[in-house]
Amino acid sequence: MAELTISSDEIRSAIANYTSSYSPEASREEVGVVTAAADGIAQVSGMPSVMANELLEFPGGVIGVAQNLDTDSVGVVILGNFETLKEGDEVKRTGEVLSIPVGEKFLGRVINPLGQAIDGLGDIESEEERALELQAPSVLMRQPVEEPMQTGIKAIDAMTPIGRGQRQLIIGDRKTGKTSVCIDTILNQRDNWATGDPKQQVRCIYVAVGQKGSTIASIRKTLEDHGALEYTTIVAAPASDSAGFKWLAPFTGAALGQHWMYQGKHVLVIYDDLTKQAEAYRAISLLLRRPPGREAYPGDVFYLHSRLLERAAKLNDELGGGSLTALPIIETKANDVSAFIPTNVISITDGQVFLESDLFNQGVRPAINVGVSVSRVGGAAQTKGMKKVSGSLRLDLAAYRDLEAFAAFASDLDPASKAQLERGKRLVELLKQKETEPQSVEDQMVSIYLAGEGEFDDVPVEDVRRFESELLENLHATHGGVFEQIKGGTPFSDESKAELAGAVQDFKQGFQTTDGTPVINEPEARPLGDDEVTKSQITVSRKTQ
């Protein structure tokens, strides 16, 4: 058995190392106590130095955001499961404001408002963070909106164009296609993403507030099936989440988008929808005992939306020239755009696309009311070619709507009014589009130009969409040079116009309508003119008996 030996030198050396590395430290920690907790709100006492919007840590890893800073207590919005909290629980300050991780790895993922992955594909690694409450870019940091943000929807790109850095409101009753318009806009960025050019690529963020979980899953599948998920991030705060999550979700989307914008990249953020965010904020404010105002909303609900939407901008070239385009969605009741939240957001944004339930029920989809919809800054971003071909489209449609209302009561119309009415019917039919089928700007220009030239006037109304689809397919196959000439929205040249006119006439010769009749009929026989007849005298001899 080996003998145990103790070396005094080793013991002395170990003690010396331990004492030399020891440095006395005194730390101070401010803690509070929960005095009440219910409905996602906690009242905490004993934290006199807490900051507004500071993160507080509760037992079990639950966090909250300090909102009401009263003299003797703090009103805290709980983020997460508040049912485990009870009176007497200890609360610690973190000294940090609410922030989320950001970066390229968030593309293709579904996250909650805290930036945590909820799609079952593992955690998202990120070395950067960005605060949720950030100052919007100042006036000197911006430049005018001049680049188009193509939606792929003819009615929007032609009449209410959207530019990169713009805030365009999508407003309408429930079930009028508001989300579909925004999803189609995301799908239309696929070709830009495929180029690999950072100046053309658009990163998309879809913020779902207060929707059913099944609806969010369906949207994710639609994006995945069409190859759009790889450049899209979904921020989900479904109806089952607490009011705190619904309130913060749009700010999470904005923070993620601003990170890319300040890197000189282009971003599209869709807030679906801000009505539910306002309702969640109203619930939080009432539970915090803040004084209610109109429709029981707190006095700062306008500031809630303005500070969010002001983050959309087109930065100047010194800051990289990045942009953040915002498409907020607002749900109305009975098409009432004069309610509190709709009027607030209309006054904040740069224009609105108004979707009407009556048009939707008539089969006009997207159900855009041209008379109420407007884009205040997008006109400068519209391509020159589209601006030329669609110049009179809005007026033609508005005149058609007026004439249609008049024709319902008038017994007889003059030929000019009848022709205008017939062309209006075909324009309405031409502007209809199926979901998840956005059109390129070149296809839109060709369709609208030909409609303006009257090439659809002799096509039956029920065949207009099929005629357009088959015509574009034929033109791509046989006259691809026209599309190359107008690529990117360049105006039509005289040669392209002449080529199109001939190509359409050739196509009409073989097009069969639904009832089997050709669009161009054989001309009716006409009597010969005097100059076309050769006159000669015929001598008739008669036999005499």
UniProtKB/Swiss-Prot annotation:
Region Disordered, annotated ranges: 511-545
Protein location: Cell membrane
Chain positions recorded as ATP binding sites: 172-179
GO cellular component: plasma membrane; proton-transporting ATP synthase complex
Keyword DNA repair attributed: no
HAMAP family, alphabetized: ATP_synth_alpha_bact
Family note: Belongs to the ATPase alpha/beta chains family.
Protein name according to UniProt: ATP synthase subunit alpha
Organism: Corynebacterium jeikeium (strain K411)
Taxonomic placement: Bacteria, Bacillati, Actinomycetota, Actinomycetes, Mycobacteriales
